[in-house]
C-alpha cells in the first residue's frame, strides 16, 4: 500500500528533506524542516490539516514521549520540572489517529525511566498508544499490562526490565530485533 506523509502545517504527501542549499522557505514541515517538492504533493491551511487529523483520516501517527504507561497513556507535552509546556498537535494526533506509535529512547538523558506503570507527567492522551518502540525493546500496552514483543540484540529481559518502570508480560514468542 502507498504511504502518504501528512504535516499538520498543511502538506499531504510530504517529500523527503531538502538537500543543503536547495531549501525552499515555502516547503516546511511541522518540525521546521525544509522539504523537497514531489509530484502529488498538496497544500492546504493548517485548519484543514487539523480537520483531517480530528476527523480520523490519519491511519498512523508516530510521536515521541516523555512517559508512556503500561496501559498506553501518553505524556509528551510538558516536563513538570520546567513548569511550562506546549501541547501543539500531539493531543489531536493522540485522539484522532487510528493508531499511535511512540518512538523514543528507553530512558531520558539522566537514565530516568520513561515507560512507567502510571504516568506522573501531564497526560496528552489516555490509553491511546498501541505500540512503543525504543532503542532497547518493542512493547505493546494493553489493559492487562505491557507485553514485551521484541528485545534489542545483546540485551537480556532482566536488563531491559531494570530500566523500565512497569513490569512486562513476556510472551513465549519473544523475538530479538532484526536490525
Language-model-derived ranges and their functions:
Residues 13-179:
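Conserved phosphate- and dinucleotide-binding cores of soluble alpha/beta proteins
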